[in-house]
Amino acid sequence: MTSNTPGAPWPSAPAAASQLDVSKGLITSLSAGLIIHRVGQVAYGFAEEARGFSRELQRYMNTRLSSDATTLVYEEVLGQYGRMHWLVHMKTPSDYGRLLHMVDHDKAFQEIYQGNRLPERGGGNWERIFVQGSFRENVMVPQHGFAKESMDELEPGRFVPPARHQLAPTGQPHLDSSSAGALVLRTVQARYESRDLARYYLYEWQSYVNKAAPGIITAALFEEIWGSQDKLHVALHLRSLDDYQRLHQLETQDEGLKQLMAKPRVSLAGQPTGWGGLFANATMTDTVLLPLPPPRA
């Protein structure tokens, strides 16, 4: 329910789990070995068509790849207008082979993106619904340098320890990409000379935030592979979009977190410097996503 009352809660959409027909065997941001993050820019005036295409593609992928991959869809609400995000959660890189095989050989899948979806608008499919050349993919794996599970204790077939091993018990259920009401993807580029310290700082920051806001914010750490070296990602799973304000309050008003952030980490130009000295300036971005809602009745 939408409200124009000042201070009223942001109207919430169902969590991404509502996009799925079944929850058994679900792979999420806390259980995946890697996440393929695909982004596409919707052409202006084609938002409803983009949502319909995304739902149909997602439904088919989850049906055909149910044991190997779970795809969840989100819309960017703070950042770039009109961008769709797909998070394809997999256990290992080899599972990507099934996806490629489906794209190349599955006739029903090909019909979804080749058939005429715009008969009343001059014809066409995704190539008109989305801006050409706007699709990009990043591959993220859970940050495993500080995970509580050692690499030699991995389950058979696992790539790295899933992100759930980063998290200490809080007395509240952890949020993940299927249960969160909103998802913030925070991305930052570590300086090469302080790359290990940057990872450790984010681990300390993550641990503090999870303890300070249990059941409200769950932070999980990832890093990019097959892309930019030392580009780090924090997946901030929020109970609702309103809790983005709670995150801001923690970073600006919580004395314990402020002390952690101000703690000298590295020396720059002979001066002890806090967390900012670990990262390339002006590279930290927050992309705020909401789960794609069900179609309107």
Task: Annotate each PLM feature.
Residues 2-262, 266-297:
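Short S/T/G/P-rich N-terminal loop/turn motif that feeds into the first structured element of a domain
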